[in-house]
Structure formats: C-alpha cells, structure tokens
C-alpha cells in the first residue's frame, strides 16, 4: 500500500555470464569479482527488506550519517515521528502540455460528457461562449423552452469553479480524510488526533456540530464512509475492526465489525458500503478484500486479491454488484460480487498501465468508467469494456517491482516524469500535473448535478488541489494555500464548493468569488500589469437552477 516501499529486490540481479573471468579454456571467477558479487547480494537483500518495509533508513545527526532501523509498520501510516509531508513542497510536478486524447475520440464517454454539459453538436464558436452571451441567448428565447437545460446549467457552472478560500478549520495534527455526504448536508473530517468531526452544511453553512473520539485507532484513522441512509458513518485504521457510529443523538454508539484477519499487524486502508447498507467492503495490507455482512454480523468473504497491499476499493454503481480494487502491484481489478468465492478468487478482468502502486480509485457511478491515482504521478481513466491483456498486466507488475525509491520520504525519480506508455496499457487517458508523495492521495470525478462530471480533481503532495478537464487532460484550476500535502478532496454534490484536507492540519473550504482580477484566470503576460491589491471580492451572481432530486 502507500506505506510499503517501492524498491525492488530484483533490480540489481546479474546475468549468469556476468563477472566470469576467462583464463585459458575455462571460465573462473576472480577473487575480486567474487567479493563484488557478494556486495551485490547484500545490496539485493537490503533492497528487498526496504521494499517489504521491514527496515528503513533514517537521517542521523551527521550529514552523511544514515541509520538502518527496523520499521514499525509496513505501511505509509507510521508513528508520529514519520515524515510530515512537507518534502513535496519542493517538488514541482511536470504538467503535460499535450495530453494524448486519441483513445477518447471514439469512446462513448466523450458523448456522455457532451450531453451532460450541453456541448454535444455545438459549433466551436458556441462552445467558447461566455456566461453573459449564454444569458443573452436565454433572454432571446433561444434556449430550450426558454430556460437552460440541465446540460447548459452544467456548462454555465464551469465558468464558476471554486477559486477562493472561504473557511479554514485548524487541527493539532494531520487531516487524513474529508468527504461530503451524498446529499451534501454533512461534511465529515478525520484527523490523526483520533477525532472525527461532523459539519452542518445546510443553508450555505459550514458549522461543526459534533466531535467524536474514534476507538481502537492505530496511528490514525485511514478511511471513512457514510451509510446510505445518512444516519451512521464508518471508519477504519490499523485495527482488526471497522467501526460504525451514529451521527445523530446525544451519545456515541460504536459498533465493531470484526474482520478476523490472519495478519498480526493489520490495517484497512479503504472502505466502501453497498447501496442497501448491508455489506461493508474493505481493502487491507494483507493483499485481501474483506466483505462484512451487517445483517449476519460476520465476515462473509476474505478474497486474496492482490500481490501486495490493497489501497483502494469502490463499488461501480448503486447495484453494488460490480466492484473495483487497486493495490501496490499497480493493477486495478474488476470483481463481480455474485461470483466472488474464497476458494476461487478470480476477478472478471484487470486494468493495467500504471507503473507503480495505485493509491485511490473513484467510480463514475455508471458501472463502466473509473479513475485511479498512482504513485507513478498520474491519474488514469479506464473503461471496463476494455480489459487489459496478459502482456499489459505483466508489464505493469514488472514496472512496479523495479521501482527503487520510497514515495513516503524520497523525491520522485526523473524517469517518472517521462511520458512512457507500457505495452498493453488499456487506459483511455492519462493525466499529469499533480504530485503523489507521502500518503495515499485521493482523486475523484466532479459531481454530475453541477458539473456533468466534466472534471477530475485530485489532492497533491505540493499542497494544492488540482482540477483537470476530463476530455482534454489540461489543468483548468489549481487551488493553492496548504503548507503540506493534500491527502483528500471532496466536491459538494450540488454546489460549487471544494473541501481540501491536508497534512498541515488544516481543513479548507473553497468557493467561487468574483473579483476584477484573479491571477489564476489571467494570462501570465498580463500578471505584471495587475496591482497587488485588488477590489474586495463579491459573491458569485445567483443563477436559477432546478433543485436536486
């Protein structure tokens, strides 16, 4: 998982013919070469131990004093003296100026987004219309039935992406998770201080109304989820249990769901809840998927799913029959809940193309498209109708095992900056321009109601929120204010608001604010002509939209 080192034990292997000294007609190893091979063997052993997370290197007092100590965990989530996430501030992720969109040209997702944003069939000049021009057309009765369609509403809102910091809450330790409920009325935040905070988001507010002390927490809460009815939430940590707790009411009732793992040190890095609230899905550091049935109150499945930590799980749609998993083996797997068996753990397909471990997966909600974030510093868009070949899976596995750096505390190697496409890569699109360091950074599709899911947004190790255009692959917005990596991001399902959760201990709410000048919206050539002190921002003008169902 994000915790495990990426180094490879086999990266320093030698060909059988290397190191042989040819003397006369025979082949013998010289003493010097034997000693050299001995050193190589030790290096291989050290690389293996580092990759498995059983030991780690720490900086001593001297500039060149490196110490080898036994690791307390084999995950990214370590003790409080671990790296605080600020190294990534010095890393400037390279932006892909010319994303490869060829695979999207004839894929159905282009039509879907075009319909959802009112762009399908429009000429280039119409696509470039400003918001006032769209209003003018509506007033002239040129819109459908005299008002904006749902697609046109989404296109209007693309002019008002969040760009201004409107609220900050500060914690004493790192913020790990932060998500909106399905109806957008509650925001839930989980911090390393073992406290889960709930915020009331109704009527434009963002007011904390409850703080709950999590139980049985090892180092930090790692993931959270709401139940479909919105009355309870779940959280996971370094523990054998996933806990469920009530949101409303005076007291806090914590129920422990025992997964009964085989590992002594066990963590659930990712959780998801089925649409009927009955089953809880978890991905763990033992390479297994766990399914817990709340009605039977027992674990019903333990599936050996990945060769390394399972960092991400997600249901494909509201049917909860198709699910996704991703791990440190760089493979995303697709499972059918109806055919999952412990004695025959076979996925229905796999998606390969990443070159390092997967940190997060988000489904578009249509049981077809998903995105995955990875330690190879990319997001990939997938179509489950395009599974990868055996060649693609082997290429991804090999690339992942050959990584020889630790993303928790080392800088990104320059080779990761190159636009390399592995053989058999079946992804539709690759997005570059954000950093994935230190922790399992999340990425998500933008909401369907307000944006038509035309954007992908992600946290970043440099303390930013990065928003990509799904179809073009270009960055359309960067929100910058944090001093450490942004681990989680969440977009309000019906409003233009984004909340970022960072390792600098801050929770930040971003909204659109209109002003005469905004540097992010201005060409760099015009920057110098803008005064440093601009006019006071004013709220976005209200636009009539249909209410959410």
Curated annotation (Swiss-Prot):
Sorted alphabetically, the keyword list is: Phosphoprotein, Repeat, Ubl conjugation pathway, WD repeat
InterPro entries, A to Z: DCAF, DCAF11/LEC14B, G-protein_beta_WD-40_rep, WD40/YVTN_repeat-like_dom_sf, WD40_repeat_dom_sf, WD40_rpt
Per the record's keyword annotation, is Metal-binding included, yes or no?
A: no
Renumbered residue ranges of the record's region Disordered? 1-40
Record note on quaternary structure: Interacts with DDB1 and CUL4A.
UniProt function note: May function as a substrate receptor for CUL4-DDB1 E3 ubiquitin-protein ligase complex.
The molecule here is called DDB1- and CUL4-associated factor 11
Species of the source: Mus musculus
Name the encoding gene, please: Dcaf11
């Amino acid at each position: 998982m994000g915790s495990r080192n990426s180094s490879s034990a086999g990266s320093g292997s030698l060909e059988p013919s290397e190191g042989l000294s040819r003397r006369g007609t025979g082949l013998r190893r010289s003493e010097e070469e034997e000693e050299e091979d001995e050193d190589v063997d030790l290096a291989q052993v050290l690389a293996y131990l580092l990759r498995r997370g059983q030991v780690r290197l720490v900086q001593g007092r001297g500039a060149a004093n490196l110490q080898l100590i036994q690791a307390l965990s084999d995950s990214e989530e370590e003790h409080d003296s671990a790296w605080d996430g600020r190294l990534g501030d010095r890393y400037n992720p390279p932006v892909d100026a010319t994303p490869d969109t060829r695979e999207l040209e004839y894929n159905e997702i282009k039509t879907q987004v075009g319909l959802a944003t009112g762009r399908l069939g429009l000429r280039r000049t119409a696509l470039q219309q400003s918001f006032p021009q769209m209003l003018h057309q509506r007033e002239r009765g040129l819109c459908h039935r005299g008002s904006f369609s749902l697609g046109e509403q989404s296109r209007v809102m693309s002019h008002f992406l969040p760009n201004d910091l409107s609220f900050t809450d500060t914690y004493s330790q790192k913020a790990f998770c932060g998500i909106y409920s399905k109806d957008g009325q509650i925001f839930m935040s989980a911090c390393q201080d073992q406290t889960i905070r709930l915020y009331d988001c109704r009527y434009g507010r963002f007011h904390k109304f409850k703080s709950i002390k999590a139980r049985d927490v090892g180092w930090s809460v790692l993931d959270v989820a709401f139940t479909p009815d919105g009355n309870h939430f779940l959280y996971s940590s370094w523990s054998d249990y996933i806990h469920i707790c009530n949101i409303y009411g005076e007291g806090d009732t914590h129920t422990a769901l025992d997964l009964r793992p085989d590992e002594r040190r066990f963590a659930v890095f990712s959780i998801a809840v089925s649409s009927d609230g009955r089953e809880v899905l978890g991905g763990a550091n033992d390479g297994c998927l766990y399914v817990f049935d709340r009605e039977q109150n027992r674990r019903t499945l333990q599936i050996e799913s990945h060769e390394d930590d399972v960092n991400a799980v997600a249901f494909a749609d509201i049917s909860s029959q198709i699910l996704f998993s991703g791990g440190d083996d760089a493979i995303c797997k697709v499972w059918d809940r109806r055919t999952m068996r412990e004695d025959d753990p076979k996925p229905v397909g796999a998606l390969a193309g990443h070159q390092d471990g997967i940190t997060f997966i988000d489904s578009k909600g249509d049981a077809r498209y998903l995105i995955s974030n990875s330690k190879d510093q990319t997001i990939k868009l997938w179509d489950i109708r395009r599974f990868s070949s055996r060649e693609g899976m082997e290429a991804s596995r090999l690339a992942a095992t050959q990584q020889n750096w630790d993303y928790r505390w080392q800088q990104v190697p320059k080779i990761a900056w190159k636009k390399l496409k592995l053989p058999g890569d079946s992804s539709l699109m690759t997005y570059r321009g954000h950093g994935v360091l230190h922790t399992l950074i999340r990425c998500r599709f933008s909401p369907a109601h307000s944006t038509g899911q035309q954007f992908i947004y992600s946290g970043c190790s440099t303390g930013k929120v990065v928003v990509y255009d799904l179809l073009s692959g270009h960055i359309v917005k960067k929100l910058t204010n944090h001093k450490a990596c942004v681990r989680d991001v969440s977009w309000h399902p019906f409003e233009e608001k984004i909340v970022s959760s960072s390792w600098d201990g801050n929770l930040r709410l971003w909204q659109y604010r209109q002003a005469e000048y905004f540097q992010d919206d201005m060409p760099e050539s015009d920057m110098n002509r803008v005064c440093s002190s601009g006019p006071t921002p004013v709220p976005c003008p209200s636009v009539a939209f249909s209410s959410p169902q």
